[in-house]
Amino acid sequence: MATLIQRSLSLAKSSTPALQFLRFRGKINIQRPKAPHYERARVVAVTQPKYPELPKAKSCFKTRAERTQQQQENPYNEIIAREVRNWLDHSRLVAFFHLSSITADDIFRVRVQLHKQNLHLKSYGSKIIEQAVKNTRYEAIVPLFHSNHCIVFSPDPEKTAALLRIVRRVPQMVLLGGIVEETMLSRNQLVAYAQMPGLHAVQAQLVQTLSQAPGHLIQQLQAHQNSFVQVLDVHAKNQMNEETPKST
């Protein structure tokens, strides 16, 4: 009885067959597909949309600029252009860089280092830059954005030296020029400006110079009187020396 139960249990066990999927026919020809059936081809031909053709006078004699002028600009570009204009108006230091081949990790590290110095690294498209500075005093910077670029903004112009020190470690960022205190500067002028002393140091030198001027003036006014007093003192001492032997 036990042997019969064991045999029945072995037969009752489920077995998973090995399946292997095979294509019934050869590979599908994607480049030169087989022509569809006549009925299907007729349905496809009937359901194809038909667009009205433009008159030849409009398509031939109308320039490409006139045809594309009717396209509506993306409103998001206007928002970004206003943001660029806001950065330009409220930044006392603006530096323009040409970006060579550089990885995203390197850009991120440079962005973090600049942010610690209150310097903000931004990148915009050339069309957005052109839309932002059109008919403004910043229109002269448009030729700088024909290739890959980035812009650094800062409200503090004294950060120019820190900016050049950070960018010196990244050869992929090439300085083109900048705007400092609403004045357009070239690369060499920007480097020379960074080497100038700070405003507080110059103010201290001016205060020191102004404080030295009154003392120098008083010294010059009293120079003749002091020299005359010294001459009289020497003359009095000589007379006293001459009178002393006579009295003895």
Curated annotation (Swiss-Prot):
InterPro entries: Ribosomal_uL10, Ribosomal_uL10-like_sf, Ribosomal_uL10_bac_type. Keywords: Mitochondrion, Ribonucleoprotein, Ribosomal protein, Transit peptide. One of its GO terms (biological process) is mitochondrial translation. Its main location: mitochondrion. It holds the Pfam family Ribosomal_L10. GO terms for cellular component: mitochondrial large ribosomal subunit; ribonucleoprotein complex. Residues 1-24 form a transit peptide. GO terms for molecular function: structural constituent of ribosome. It is found in: Mitochondrion. Component of the mitochondrial ribosome large subunit (39S) which comprises a 16S rRNA and about 50 distinct proteins. Belongs to the universal ribosomal protein uL10 family. This is Large ribosomal subunit protein uL10m. It comes from Drosophila melanogaster. The gene is mRpL10.
